[in-house]
Amino acid sequence: MSTSHDRAVLNQILNPLMPTSDSGIAEIHLESDSLEHPGYELSLQLEREGVALAEGVRLDEAIEKFTKALEVCPKNPSAYNNRAQAYRLQNKPEKALDDLNEALSLAGPKTKTACQAYVQRASIYRLRGDDDKARTDFASAAELGSSFAKMQLVALNPYAAMCNKMLAEVFEKAKTGED
């Protein structure tokens, strides 16, 4: 007889692309960034304006807003993360990497910003063909609960995906009584 935890672990093995929260294994609850800095609230407002501009594909203006947000509060990791996204969209990966490294140095280890920055940085590494660095960052993001990072880790390991598929087929046949 198996326990619910045993079934959850087995489900993770058989369904590697399923987010852990759907499998019965406890989900990691990430912290939000919060700073004790007099300019933090204004920085957040400028950052929201920058995000709106970026969504409207006004990337130069968005970068200006993110830069202003960082001038007001230079320790705001999410502003670095968002500016990095705008740089990525402008095909400026070096600037994006600089901002992502700064975001990761400022963000707490279990924050949403850290998770997002790891995914962004890993994506840049993957595009460059540096799968080892990509794998490391995707693993960090996956540990923080990113289902996208988890999918990328499986994609970077075709043998794991093949083994999981074979195991799923064997267990399905065992369930239905097929040989």
Curated annotation (Swiss-Prot):
GO BP term, pick one: tyrosine metabolic process
SUPFAM superfamilies named in the record: TPR-like (SSF48452)
Keyword Membrane assigned: no
InterPro entries: TPR-like_helical_dom_sf, TPR_rpt, TTC36
Alphabetically ordered keywords of this record: Repeat, TPR repeat
Ranges of the TPR repeats in the UniProt entry: 43-76, 78-110, 115-148
One Pfam assignment: TPR_11
Bilayer-crossing regions: none
Family note: Belongs to the TTC36 family.
Name by which UniProt lists this protein: Tetratricopeptide repeat protein 36
